[in-house]
Regions:
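Substrate-binding cleft of extracellular glycoside hydrolase catalytic domains
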Residues: 59, 63-199, 203
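Glycoside hydrolase catalytic-domain groove-lining segments
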Residues: 217-224, 228-280
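Acidic (Asp/Glu)-rich catalytic clusters
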Residues: 12-15, 41-49, 78-88, 109, ...
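Substrate-binding cleft of secreted/luminal carbohydrate-active enzymes
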Residues: 16-27, 95, 267-299
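Conserved, mostly hydrophobic/aromatic
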Residues: 54, 163, 236-238
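Solvent-exposed loop/turn segments at secondary-structure junctions
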Residues: 27-29, 59-62, 97-101, 167-171, ...
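N-terminal module-boundary/linker segments of secreted carbohydrate-active enzymes
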Residues: 1-53, 59, 64-74
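Aromatic-lined carbohydrate-recognition surfaces of secreted/lumenal glycan-active proteins
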Residues: 22-25, 160, 164-166, 190-223, ...
Length: 299
């Protein structure tokens, strides 16, 4: 859509300008000691402004559930997305989708969830056209698509957002991760998802972001970043999830690598997840996060 193209250009220009958009997951829905308070966010409480990026999760939409994986009613989430978009915030979405082969209500964690990696045939069966799991997963994608198409502004125009399907695929804990799929199977799953949502369901409001897990210092950081790369035509945005703790070297080396890859691929990039819960070091963001970003532009 024109709005999606404008948002993509905005990400590119922000990155080139040397500025960065700060985000917070579920920022408008809940925080420390509060939940469902209109107009509130922890970031606003601390800084006076809402975060520039608002991230949320589609998890559980595959079951037509009332609430998402974090307990936010989907109707409420739609309201929050509209509110954020009206304010000029950038929306980013992930999808902790349950395991379509093992899911059943009431199973003990992690059985049937995104983190159920007990079967390494799930991806293989999903991408096999006409298989029972392929049929099941298309139904799940239909439900996701119906919700995405309901994300419109006050004029009824589709709200653009960054979509991070199959995130952290470099690790082994999800059913689509390194333990449960081959390189070819993962790439096929990515393409199947994109083409089904775009071509079959007519969704054109998403910027597709890949986001490998990047927590350490790696011998070949670029190789890790492009692990199971689906192809330049199937990735719009280069992300990374970096929970480096207090390992400044890990964060700095990964930020440098993603900024270089961004130039090479001519695509915007960003740190799609990072931080420490309950951080008690006041200068964490300025001394450990911002310092690494000063000479390595990301959006």
């Amino acid at each position: 859509t024109p709005e999606t193209k404008a948002m993509y250009q905005y990400l590119l220009e922000t990155q080139k300008s040397g500025h960065i958009l700060l985000g917070h997951h579920d920022a408008l829905a809940y925080g420390h000691g509060w939940r469902d308070t209109p107009g509130k966010s922890d970031v606003k409480e601390m800084t006076g402004s809402h975060p520039a990026v608002c991230s949320m999760d589609f998890g559980k939409i595959e079951h037509n559930a009332e609430k998402n994986i974090n307990g936010i009613p989907f109707d409420k989430m739609r309201e929050l997305i509209r509110y954020a978009y009206q304010r000029g915030q950038t929306i980013m979405m992930c999808w902790h989708v349950d395991n379509p082969k093992t899911y059943a209500p009431g199973k003990p964690y992690p059985q049937g969830t995104s983190w159920d990696n007990s079967d390494n045939t799930v991806v293989r069966e999903i991408i096999q056209e006409g298989s029972p799991l392929n049929t099941t997963f298309k139904t799940w994608l239909d439900r996701l698509a119906a919700y995405i198409l309901s994300l419109t502004d006050e004029q009824g125009k589709p709200i653009p957002f960054i979509f991070r399907p199959w995130h952290e695929h470099t690790q082994s804990w999800n059913w689509w991760g390194s333990k449960c799929a081959t390189d070819e199977e993962f790439r096929a799953l990515w393409e199947f998802t994109l083409r089904y949502l775009r071509d079959e369901k007519g969704i054109h409001q998403m910027i597709y972001a890949i986001s490998p897990q990047m927590d350490e210092v790696y011998p070949d950081t670029q190789k890790r970043l492009t692990y199971r790369w689906p192809g330049d035509k199937l990735v719009d945005f280069i992300g990374m999830d970096c929970y480096h703790g207090r390992n400044k070297k890990a964060f700095a080396s990964n930020v440098k690598a993603i900024a270089e890859l961004s130039v090479q691929k001519q695509k915007p990039c960003g740190i799609t997840e990072t931080g420490i819960e309950g951080v008690n070091y006041p200068a964490y963001f300025t001394e450990e996060v911002q310092a690494a970003l000063e000479n390595n532009p990301v959006s």
